[in-house]
């Protein structure tokens, strides 16, 4: 389990308040406007025809609201929601037990659907397409197949790795949507709404400071709000102002772009130890004491989103924007690549003043504010 404050993966303490903070309807749901518009039309059409909604696949980074949307879909349809996950369905019989206990029009939510094993997935195909189960009874020459009719239902699948879904499974979803990262103004609304529910007085400036550091992810925004609330309660008058939020986040070691100490250590190692790269991910991970999986799945995606790190065929490379953010000199080899000149073999001590490349850094930097 990832214990970092800034991870978008679910942590145990998130479960305590996530349920109370979740919106119940599409009207309350903030962000993902295109997805909301489409779902509103599809749900109203299904209700008008008195048919189940087509199966829905939601994919995208963790913490963006896939589970919440599944709950909202069931609420808007006025039916029950049954929740499970790919790893929890180990055998075809487990899936059969779930499907045969559904009521007509129910919504079945399978989180991490990409982790279904192949035998279970093959049982799911006819259930999604024909609302039936094909079960083999017996073995050898005495084996026979029987078909069990199922109530018509809607499957909502969620995954952070859509590329791992097999084509037959993906093709059986009628509605497929990617969830995008949230803008700071959307996160600010989410934080102010959560503050009201939690009984916290938060000023817009304080909410904005938290939003800018939340990596475009509501789960992280709510987590930071709870920690800033603690600082406001103990060190101030209980009000989350801009000043209180900045001081609390400084103590939590979250910088203005949402980088924590793990992100900063990786960038500093890449720039100082390996002259900006390229360097293999195994070597880079070992240099900061992290596993390769943690670097690839947890640390790198946000750094690439900001334009601070590139994955290349030769290895990982820092960018001039990363050097400017950390306030460190730009290695000469990295600067040569930026300018399109042949780069000499990089040296950890061969660098160029960050002042001299300020214009390039400003052009390369990406900001959520834009």
Swiss-Prot record:
Where does it localize?
Cytoplasm
Residue span of region Head domain (RuvB-H): 256-370
- A Gene Ontology cellular-component term: cytoplasm
| Xref: Gene3D superfamilies | 1.10.8.60, P-loop containing nucleotide triphosphate hydrolases, Winged helix-like DNA-binding domain superfamily/Winged helix DNA-binding domain
Q: Which UniProt keywords apply?
A: ATP-binding, Cytoplasm, DNA damage, DNA recombination, DNA repair, DNA-binding, Hydrolase, Nucleotide-binding
Question: What's its job?
Answer: The RuvA-RuvB-RuvC complex processes Holliday junction (HJ) DNA during genetic recombination and DNA repair, while the RuvA-RuvB complex plays an important role in the rescue of blocked DNA replication forks via replication fork reversal (RFR). RuvA specifically binds to HJ cruciform DNA, conferring on it an open structure. The RuvB hexamer acts as an ATP-dependent pump, pulling dsDNA into and through the RuvAB complex. RuvB forms 2 homohexamers on either side of HJ DNA bound by 1 or 2 RuvA tetramers; 4 subunits per hexamer contact DNA at a time.
The similarity annotation says: Belongs to the RuvB family.
* Protein name per Swiss-Prot or TrEMBL: Holliday junction branch migration complex subunit RuvB
Q: What organism is this sequence from?
A: Heliobacterium modesticaldum (strain ATCC 51547 / Ice1)
Gene that specifies this protein: ruvB
């Amino acid at each position: 389990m990832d214990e970092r404050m800034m991870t978008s993966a679910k942590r145990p303490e998130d479960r305590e308040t996530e349920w109370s903070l979740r919106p119940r309807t599409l009207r309350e749901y903030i962000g993902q406007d295109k997805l909301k518009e489409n779902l509103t039309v599809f749900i109203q059409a299904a209700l008008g025809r008195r048919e189940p909604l087509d199966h829905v696949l939601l994919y995208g980074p963790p913490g963006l609201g896939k589970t919440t949307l599944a709950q909202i879909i069931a609420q808007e349809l006025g039916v029950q929601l049954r929740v499970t996950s790919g790893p929890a369905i180990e055998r075809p019989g487990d899936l059969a037990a779930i499907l045969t206990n559904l009521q007509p029009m129910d919504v079945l939510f399978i989180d991490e659907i990409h982790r279904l094993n192949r035998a279970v997935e093959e049982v799911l195909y006819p259930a999604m397409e024909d609302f039936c189960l094909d079960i083999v009874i017996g073995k050898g020459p005495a084996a026979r197949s029987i078909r069990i009719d199922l109530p018509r239902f809607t499957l909502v699948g969620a995954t952070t790795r859509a590329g791992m879904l097999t084509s037959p499974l993906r093709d059986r979803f009628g509605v497929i949507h990617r969830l995008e990262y949230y803008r700071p103004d959307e996160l600010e609304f989410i934080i102010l709404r959560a503050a009201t529910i939690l009984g916290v007085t938060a000023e817009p400036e304080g909410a904005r400071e938290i939003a800018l550091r939340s990596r475009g992810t509501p789960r992280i925004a709510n987590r930071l709000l709870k920690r800033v609330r603690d600082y406001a309660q103990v060190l101030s008058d209980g009000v989350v102002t801009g000043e209180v939020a900045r001081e609390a986040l400084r103590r939590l070691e979250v910088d203005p772009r949402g980088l924590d100490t793990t992100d900063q250590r990786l960038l500093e190692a890449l720039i100082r130890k390996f002259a900006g790269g390229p360097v293999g991910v195994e070597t880079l991970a070992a240099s900061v004491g992290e596993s390769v999986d943690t670097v690839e799945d947890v640390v790198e995606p946000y750094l690439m989103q900001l334009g601070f790190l590139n994955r290349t065929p030769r290895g990982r490379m820092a960018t001039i924007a990363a050097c400017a953010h950390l306030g460190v000199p730009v290695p000469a080899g990295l600067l040569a690549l930026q300018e399109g000149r042949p780069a000499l073999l990089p040296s950890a001590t061969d660098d160029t003043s960050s002042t001299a490349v300020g214009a390039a850094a400003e052009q390369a930097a990406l900001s959520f504010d834009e």
